[in-house]
Amino acid sequence: MKRGLLIFLLSGIFHLVNGQNIEKYHSRYMHPFGALTLTGGVGIAYYMGDLRDGVSSHPGLGPSVSVGALYRLTEHFSARGEIRFYQVAADQKYSKKFNNNLSFRTRNPDLNLGIQADVFAYNRHKKVNPYFLAGVGVTYMTPKAEIDGNWESLAPLQTEGIKYNRLPLVFMAGIGLSSKIAERWSIGMELCNNFVNSDYLDDVSDVYPDFSTLSSDLARRLSDRSSEVGLPPQQPGWHRGRPNRKDMYMFLQVRVNYLIGTRKEAHERKNVRCP
């Protein structure tokens, strides 16, 4: 009896709130749950890690591209998922730690799931809507370095004598702004910082290894490149990176969104088009 009464009361509250929303937004109200939006973005990626030493003449910028979708959960919250591709790079030749002379370039995919929180409700139909985002994903790291005119993959060489995980978790957080330009189209800007659960995005983390344990002459040459700038070789145990700081990369993108909507909205549009 009590259980039935509780269900009845909760159902009544839900319909009351839903009815107030409909009255608030009048004929333009659409229940937000299930509204689907396709997203795309293009912009720049910026690297922050062991080979960055303040602002230098080598900014470490590269391109970034993303495609994904938003699935509306409530008036303010959406689940989001994306696949992204990015390139970042750095070269110590242009930094205060030029004596190490290490460099890298990586072109990586990443996949993530998260939550987006819009400042204005879905049914407010605001032309401009700021939002916040947070999520988690994975990235596949493919660091390379150029030597003798060739780009060599660094991870298989184990330049620090360590075999590291090339598919680490990535935690993301960011802000954005979306501006409606048509009934179903919007454009905007998004800034997203990506915290990698690894210090090997750039293949540099800890100390110089015992070079005799490395697998090849190529591995030894790419582990210690000081001689290329006329400096004496590094010694095992000397600092090569900063193991207490994990790597990050940041995206600044122009975004384009297309609202598909819910099944109910699609059905209503179909009825409007029919004579």
Language-model segments: residues:
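Residues that define the transmembrane beta-barrel architecture of outer-membrane proteins
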Residues: 34, 59-63, 107-111, 128, ...
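Extracellular loop and loop/strand-boundary signature of outer-membrane beta-barrel proteins
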Residues: 25-26, 48-55, 97-104, 157-163, ...
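Gram-negative (and chloroplast) outer-membrane scaffold detector with strong preference
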Residues: 77, 82-149
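Residues on the lipid-exposed face of transmembrane beta-strands in outer-membrane beta-barrel proteins
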Residues: 40-44, 67-71, 113-117, 134-138, ...
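Predominantly the C-terminal beta-signal and adjacent terminal strand-loop region
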Residues: 182-275
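Outer-membrane beta-barrel translocator domains and adjoining extracellular loop/strand segments
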Residues: 50-55, 91-98, 143-151, 200-207
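Short glycine/proline- and aromatic-enriched beta-strand/turn motifs that initiate or cap beta-hairpins
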Residues: 20-70, 247-263
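Short loop/turn motifs that connect adjacent beta-strands in outer-membrane beta-barrel proteins
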Residues: 21-35, 76, 121-128, 181-184, ...
